[in-house]
Amino acid sequence: MSRYRGPRVRIIRRLGALPGLTNKTPQLKSSSINQSTSNKKISQYRIRLEEKQKLRFHYGITERQLLNYVRIARKAKGSTGEVLLQLLEMRLDNIIFRLGMSPTIPGARQLVNHRHILVNGYIVDIPSYRCKPQDFITIKNQRKSETIISKNIEFYQKYKIPNHLIYNSLEKKGLVNQILDHESIGLKINELLVVEYYSRQA
């Protein structure tokens, strides 16, 4: 299954706020939601499916990619759900988004694909590149690159940068300080339901 390229507002109306997908907020009538949910019993499968979809759309990844991340998380030490979120949060496109260099993860992916981003001084054009502690994220020394990202940072610096990241505005340099903790996740999600959804596949 490929990445979703349709209307983003339609997705957040169904799943709720997904800041990685869009900075717009869903406008829903609470009364209509309550009526629709009370009139029909929501199955456990649907609940797990929607949590899985939240992860997919927020991080902008394909079904196959998410399944692969779940499989990697299952083999790692520690809680599968927490490891899964750490893997997704340490993607380069997400790190750029969380640093405020891009308003959304799709926007961050474009910056990476167009070779605007350096990791430890080297151009990296793979959005799924897995960052690690002490990685430095910088902008390619070209006017176009600096102009694009400086505008984003100026606008989005009102949002708090999570504790596992540091951004130096003078040097225009980001640092992955550590592996993030659960409180730093930028999404309201029950990752255990996602793991349960994939229990027969992973």
Swiss-Prot record:
Sorted UniProt keywords: Chloroplast, Plastid, Ribonucleoprotein, Ribosomal protein, RNA-binding, rRNA-binding
GO MF term list: rRNA binding; structural constituent of ribosome
Lineage of the organism: Eukaryota, Viridiplantae, Streptophyta, Embryophyta, Bryophyta
Residues annotated as domain S4 RNA-binding: 90-153
Quaternary organization: Part of the 30S ribosomal subunit. Contacts protein S5. The interaction surface between S4 and S5 is involved in control of translational fidelity.
Annotated Pfam families: Ribosomal_S4 (PF00163), S4 (PF01479)
Primary gene name: rps4
Protein's UniProt name: Small ribosomal subunit protein uS4c
Location in the cell: Plastid, Chloroplast
Species in which this protein is naturally found: Catharomnion ciliatum (Moss)
Gene Ontology CC terms, in alphabetical order: chloroplast; small ribosomal subunit
Function: One of the primary rRNA binding proteins, it binds directly to 16S rRNA where it nucleates assembly of the body of the 30S subunit. With S5 and S12 plays an important role in translational accuracy.
Similarity comment text for this entry: Belongs to the universal ribosomal protein uS4 family.
